[in-house]
Each structure stands twice: as C-alpha cells, then as structure tokens.
Amino acid sequence: MNTKRVAVALAVLAALFSSGVQQADACTRATYIGPDNMVVTGRTMDWKEDIMSNIYVFPRGIQRAGYNKGETVKWTSKYGSVIATGYDIGTCDGMNEKGLVASLLFLPESIYDRPGDTRPTMGISIWTQYVLDNFATVREAVDELKKETFRIDAPQMPNGSASTLHLAITDETGNTAILEYLNGELNIHESKEYQVMTNSPRYEYQLAINDYWKEVGGLQMLPGTNRSSDRFVRASFYIHAIPQTADAKIAVPSVLSVMRTVSVPFGITTPDKPHISSTRWRSVSNQKDKVYYFESTLTPNLFWLDLKKIDFSPKAAVKKLALTNGEIYAGDAVKDLKDSSSFTFLFQTPVL
C-alpha cells in the first residue's frame, strides 16, 4: 500500500472517530467471485424502522418515465426483473433476467444538484429500475450513465429521511460499478475488484481505509463496530476468505453467512449512537443461475425466486410477493407470486 493511501486512510479514520456526524441508516453489500463463473451478490437492508418492502416481478415491455411532469427520460423495459421495494415507492434492490444486480444504499455525502441544471429529470425512486430495465452488463450501463444526460430528483422519503443514496451494480461476470453523486457530479468506480460497498465515507475513502486494514491483517484483528467503515472491512475480509467453489449449494450460503456477519441485531437501539440501525432483511443473488434469495429478519425461512421459471414476456402480468403483513414463504416461492398492479414511484410532486 502506498504512502499516500496510508495517509488518506489514517486521516479519514481520525475524522470518522472524532466527527459528531452520525449516520441514520446503513446497509452492506458484497460480491463473491468464484470459479466457473460463479458470481453471487449479497446485501443487507438496515433501517431504523420497518421499510415496508415487498417483492415485485416486472416483465419486459413496460413503458416508463423517469419523472411525472416536465422533461424527463422515457423508456420501454428491455429486460424483466425481480425487485424489492422500499416503502413501496421505489426499487432499492433487484436482479434482471440477464443477471445484472442493482442495489441502492445510504450515502449521507450525496449531493445531486448543480446550479441552474436544466437536464431532463430522473427520480431517485426509479433510478435503480431504470438500470435493471435497460442494461445487461455493467459496461453497457456505465457507457450510458457516464453521459450524464439526466439530473436526479431526490425528495424526502415517507419517514422524512433525506434520499441521499448511492448505487452499486454488478453483472454476471462479477464486474461492478459504484455510482455516487458528489457535488452534483456523477462519480463512477468500475472494477471487478470493487466487491464491497457500505455507506459513508465516499467510496474512494472506503477503499483507502480497507487498504489500511489489509496491512493489519484480518487474521490478527478486524474492526468490530457497526460503523460503515468497519462493516466494509469485515465484509471485504470474509467475502475473500470464504471457500472458492463453483457449487451454488456452498457459494450462496457462504455469501449469506457473510451478510449475517455484518448485520445489526434486530431491536438494537443505542441512544448515543443513532447511526446504528437494525437489519430488516437480506438478499442474495446467484447471478450465474439467475436465482434471487430473500430473508426477512422477522420470518423464519429463506425463500427464493428462480428467474428461469418466470414468464418475463411483454404479455405477462406484473406479479407480487406481499411481505408487509407477516406473510411467510419458504423455498421456491415462484408458485406464491400473485398478479398485481405496480406500486407508484415517488416523485417530488404528487402523482395525480
């Protein structure tokens, strides 16, 4: 590790421990890259209250708009997807039929606005869905997104929290891109090496911190708090330490075990540490075999949706797995999907 990155890491660590700024919510994401094209991505959803998530299946051929008034981006979905919502007003996680996984996580440093920006508008609630609808690979997505042809509109969430978020996308080859809006500019980090993402600080600083802990050595000591930077280091160590295997029966549970390792126990409340939020659910995407796994903290079973068994043709209906009333599913849940209308994406102005 070079001297400059050591200096950056130490400076950021000092700032994190001395700062009075607390993160309200948190999540962790990690991608496993194994032999024989075995790629598995897991994430936790950590939130200070029930985020009222449901699972939806979207077919191809849906006509969408990135905003509900004025000049916006419009498209027709090329790919079907399985997604998880937040508050049933936006897509926060999912995988499309090509094995592209997209995950939206909290980033308090996000600033989307540029002075006098007149570009077409894209709502933050539909940004993740835009990626899943339109791209099969990270390279395709990055080539288009780096053009910055739209601006992001980010209204407050239903609970009043700021929609300060960043997006991670990973394709079936294991290539990942981290997308962060900082001071109105889109910053993109793309590499197969970028296997882990959490929250604050901005991604380049997280990489520097992780470099520092690599020098310490995970077998000697790992940071154990629920801080974003500590979870990043633990997830990074374990995602590389678990067995290298082409067997999905080993790879998927291994990634799930990493996600459990970085989860925050349910019901944890620490008055002087409001940045600690309970893990509400975990997802794991087997991108080689196109299977989306989901585990709620409050239900006893893991369930999954095999995308190969789902009809994504344009004539197919939108389908839903309801999760907000204590529903319990186990194993292959394709049979439990019900025809449904879509949820309404949240934009700055009310949809009339």
Short names for language-model regions:
Residues 16-23:
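C-terminal segment of classical bacterial N-terminal signal peptides
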Residues 25-119, 152, 330-331, 336:
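A contiguous strand-loop segment
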Residues 147-184:
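Catalytic cofactor-binding cores of redox enzymes
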Residues 1-10:
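Bacterial N-terminal signal peptides that target proteins for export
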